[in-house]
């Protein structure tokens, strides 16, 4: 969809601290909220590494010192070997009451199906965190854009109010001359004074609203603006896919892998390799009367097949429900976003037309006000009627500024939905 840029014909608002919209977007990267999102992304990546680390062997050294109440064999021997040792001079089946062992133990999974499923689960969760970080960035950018457009609306409304105030003051001076000359009653000035007071009240209320928007931007950027910054739509919106769904889609894929992992844990066998080797020392062998030592070790390939575990069956049911919830959540969010897209696009078309109509209305109100100022000065129009023309021009300008602000806010909403980085779109 091509979005037309509204040409702003009103008085340009100057930022006293010379901050640009790009600088505001850049400042977002340094804020704690987005840094937290970055840490969440890193935690997701490390979570996958943690699961994958289970594929690696574990290596442990061990040692022991054991004293028995009766002589105990140093290591297991088959009967034939034990018989030969007993008959060989200078040899003996090693028995002792005190035995020391030093060795190494290695364990390594050869086949554990659930580890593969869990690794894929963590991969999708890491991607979900990545997309979530990007989405939060786009939301923050859209918030800044919306707040700045609101501030721009109020700034230009202030310009119009001050212009109206100046216009009324000029008329006040003309009426004062007529009152002093006796051509108009003194109450004519009271009506003008009342109008000036109303304008001052409106100006004060707008300044309060401005402070709220300035604070909103400051919370996100740590930059306190004095006025709104200029904005121009540099590139058109890219409508590739609904980016706002990506974190949920990756979370759904993670839920599917989570269910598969629980099923694998319940039904799939596990194969593991275990290796052990130790040096065993016997103090004061029973027969030889001296210390001896022998090496002893084994390797083992073991298989474990789950037959029945009620808790795992319950876990499967819970994971199925969670998966269904995630699916329904995506369907719900997708329907809502599609409705939002359709509504925003229709609004943008209407706002384009409103911008043209309000600009034309401003021209007409300016011409009418010129005639009204002359008429009231010459006494051919009451002060009430003249002030209505001042209000008419003020209202026409306000409606135009409001249309411009609403269009910026609508664009900001679409950029979040479609995942467009405003830093490259708005200059």
Which residues are covered by each model-predicted region?
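Start-of-domain marker
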Residues: 23-64
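Acidic, low-complexity, intrinsically disordered peripheral segments
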Residues: 67-69, 225, 399-427
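Amphipathic alpha-helical coiled-coil scaffold segments and their short linker/junction regions
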Residues: 22-31, 80-86, 123, 218-276, ...
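A short glycine-centered flexible hinge/capping loop motif at secondary-structure junctions
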Residues: 179-183, 376-382
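Sec/SRP-type N-terminal targeting helices
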Residues: 35-39, 52, 109-137, 187, ...
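Small/polar, glycine/serine/threonine/aspartate-rich low-complexity segments that form flexible
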Residues: 62-105, 275-312
């Amino acid at each position: 969809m091509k979005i037309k840029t509204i040409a702003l014909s009103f008085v340009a608002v100057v930022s006293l601290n010379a901050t640009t919209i790009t600088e505001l977007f850049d400042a977002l990267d340094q804020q704690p909220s987005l840094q937290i999102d970055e840490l969440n992304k890193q935690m997701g990546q490390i979570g996958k590494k943690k699961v994958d680390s289970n594929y690696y062997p574990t290596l442990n050294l061990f040692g022991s010192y054991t004293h028995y109440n009766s002589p105990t064999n140093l290591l297991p021997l088959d009967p034939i070997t034990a018989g030969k040792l007993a008959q060989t001079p200078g040899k003996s089946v090693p028995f002792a009451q005190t035995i020391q062992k030093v060795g190494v133990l290695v364990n390594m999974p050869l086949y554990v199906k659930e580890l593969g499923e869990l690794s894929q689960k963590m991969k999708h969760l890491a991607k979900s965190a990545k997309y979530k970080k990007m989405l939060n960035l786009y939301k923050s950018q859209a918030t800044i854009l919306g707040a700045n457009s609101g501030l721009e609306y109020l700034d230009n409304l202030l310009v119009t109010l001050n212009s109206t105030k100046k216009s009324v003051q000029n008329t006040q001076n003309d009426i004062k001359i007529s009152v002093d000359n006796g051509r108009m009653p003194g109450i004519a000035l009271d009506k003008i004074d009342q109008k000036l007071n109303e304008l001052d009240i409106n100006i004060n209320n707008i300044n309060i609203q401005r402070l709220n928007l300035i604070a909103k931007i400051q919370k996100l950027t740590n930059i306190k603006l004095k006025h709104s910054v200029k904005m121009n739509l540099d590139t058109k919106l890219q409508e590739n896919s609904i980016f706002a769904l990506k974190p949920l889609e990756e979370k759904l894929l993670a839920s599917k892998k989570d269910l598969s992992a629980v099923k694998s844990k319940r039904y799939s066998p596990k194969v593991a390799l275990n290796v052990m080797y130790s040096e065993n020392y016997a103090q004061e062998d029973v027969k030889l009367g001296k210390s001896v030592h022998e090496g002893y070790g084994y390797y083992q390939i073991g298989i474990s097949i789950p037959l029945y575990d009620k808790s795992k069956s319950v876990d499967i049911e819970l994971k199925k429900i969670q998966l269904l919830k995630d699916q329904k959540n995506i369907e719900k969010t997708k329907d809502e976003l599609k409705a939002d897209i359709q509504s925003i696009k229709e609004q943008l078309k209407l706002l384009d037309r409103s911008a043209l109509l309000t600009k034309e209305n401003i021209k007409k109100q300016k011409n009418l006000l010129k005639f009204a100022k002359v008429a009231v000065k010459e006494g051919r129009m009451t002060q009430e009627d003249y002030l209505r023309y001042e209000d008419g021009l003020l209202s026409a300008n306000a409606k135009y500024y409001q249309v411009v602000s609403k269009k910026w806010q609508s664009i900001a909403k679409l950029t979040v939905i479609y995942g467009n980085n405003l830093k490259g779109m708005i200059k």
